Design a protein with these regions (language model features):
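Short coil-to-beta strand junction motifs in C2/discoidin
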Residues: 122-132
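Terminal, low-complexity interaction segments
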Residues: 10, 88-89, 102, 114-115, ...
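Surface-exposed, low-complexity/disordered Ser/Thr/Gly/Pro/Asn-rich loops and linkers
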Residues: 41-103, 209
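A short beta-strand element within beta-rich, extracytoplasmic domains
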Residues: 106-119
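Bacterial Sec-dependent N-terminal signal peptides
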Residues: 1-12
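C-terminal outer-membrane/trafficking sorting elements
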Residues: 227-305
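Short strand-edge motifs at loop-to-beta-strand transitions and within beta-strands
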Residues: 93, 178-180, 273-277
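Extracellular carbohydrate-recognition regions
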Residues: 10-60
Length: 305
C-alpha cells in the first residue's frame, strides 16, 4: 500500500550540486512503517498485490518472502533499500524532486550501487533478477503519469554463483556500480519530477536485490558564460575572471565553485567585509559558482582567463 499521501519533495537548489541518499535512515531491526521521514523525507515505498502492507522489514538476506526490505548486516546502521518480488507482491520505491534551482534542468546525472543480498538459483543460473530505474516529469505519485525506463541504469543480479542463501551486499563481489546522464529533459523552475526503482518479478524464484548510495545531479547544458541561473540581481561583480571572484553580499555566505564535470574545485566563506575569493590556482576554463546570498540560493557561470 502507498506509504504516504503528503508527498514531501526533495528540493534541488543549485545546478551541478548532487543530492545523495545512502538509506542509512532505514530501520536495522524488526518491521517499520513505509511512511518515511527524517533523512528519507521525499522518498516513498509502494507495495501492490495480495500480500502488500504498510511496513518494510530489516533483513540480512535470510528472509525469503516477497516483501520490501532494509538490507544490511545484523544490527548495522549501514542500510540499503531493496525487495524480493513474488506472484503476490511487487515493490516500487522512489522519490519526488522539485526544481528550485531557478533555471531549467535539461539533464540529470544519476548513479547508484546495486547490491545483491540474497541469491536463489532455483530458477536457473543463467537468469538474472532485475530492478529497473524509471523517471517521470508528469507523475504525482509512484503510480501516476508517464514513466521512462533508463536501460543503462538497469540493475541485474551481480553474482549468479553459489547455493541458495544470504549474500553480503556490501562485498564488492555482490555490488554493481551504475551511472548515466539523462539528456533531452525540460524541467522548468518550480516543476516537480519523480524517480523510482521497480523490482521485476522474474520467472521462478527471485533474489533479494537493493539500491544504495544514490546520487542525482541536476544540470543545464545550454548555459553560456555570464548566464544568471537564479536572482534578478547579478551576485558576482565579475564573470570574466583573472585571479579573484568579487561578490555583492550584505552578510556571510558559503561559496562553491564547480568545474564543467560537476566536481567541486573550490569552496570558501565570504562576508560584506571580505567578499573576494582567490581562484588564481584554478586552470583556465568555464566554471559554475553557487552561493547562498541574503537567504537566496544563486548560481552563475564564469570564465577563468
Amino acid at each position: 500500500m502507498l506509504a504516504s499521501l503528503s508527498y514531501a519533495q526533495v528540493s534541488l537548489t543549485a545546478l551541478n550540486t548532487a543530492y545523495t541518499q545512502n538509506f542509512d535512515g532505514l530501520a536495522n531491526s524488526g518491521t517499520s512503517s513505509t511512511t518515511l521521514n527524517g533523512t528519507l523525507a521525499g522518498w516513498y515505498i509502494l507495495e501492490t498485490g495480495s500480500n502488500s502492507n504498510t511496513t518494510y522489514t530489516a533483513s540480512t538476506g535470510s528472509a525469503t518472502a516477497g516483501d520490501t526490505y532494509s538490507y544490511g548486516a545484523s544490527a548495522s546502521t549501514e542500510r540499503a533499500l531493496g525487495s524480493i518480488a513474488s506472484s503476490n507482491l511487487s515493490s516500487r520505491y522512489g522519490a519526488q524532486f522539485k526544481n528550485d534551482t531557478g533555471n531549467t534542468i535539461d539533464q540529470l546525472q544519476i548513479s547508484y550501487i546495486g547490491e545483491e543480498w540474497r541469491f536463489d538459483p532455483a530458477r536457473g543460473t543463467t537468469i538474472k533478477d532485475q530492478i529497473t530505474f524509471e523517471y517521470s516529469t508528469d507523475a504525482t505519485s509512484l503510480t501516476t503519469g508517464t514513466w521512462t525506463a533508463v536501460t543503462a541504469l538497469l540493475y541485474e543480479t551481480t553474482n549468479l554463483t553459489g547455493t541458495v542463501g544470504t549474500r553480503n551486499g556490501n562485498d564488492a563481489a555482490y555490488r554493481t556500480s551504475l551511472s548515466n546522464t539523462i539528456t533531452g529533459l525540460n524541467i522548468s523552475a518550480g516543476q516537480t519530477f519523480w524517480i523510482r526503482f521497480v523490482d521485476v518479478n522474474v520467472s521462478g524464484t527471485d533474489d533479494g536485490l537493493a539500491v544504495d548510495d544514490f546520487s542525482l545531479t541536476p544540470k543545464n547544458s545550454t548555459l553560456s558564460v555570464g548566464d544568471v541561473i537564479k536572482s534578478k540581481n547579478i551576485f558576482l561583480k565579475n564573470t570574466m575572471v583573472d585571479n579573484t571572484l568579487s561578490f555583492q553580499t550584505k552578510g556571510n555566505a558559503s561559496v562553491k565553485v564547480y568545474n564543467t564535470n560537476g566536481q567541486l574545485v573550490k569552496s570558501a566563506t565570504i562576508s560584506a567585509q571580505n567578499a573576494n575569493v582567490d581562484v588564481a590556482s584554478l586552470p583556465k576554463g568555464n566554471y559554475v559558482v553557487t552561493a547562498v546570498l541574503d537567504g537566496e540560493t544563486v548560481s552563475q557561470k564564469i570564465l577563468k582567463k
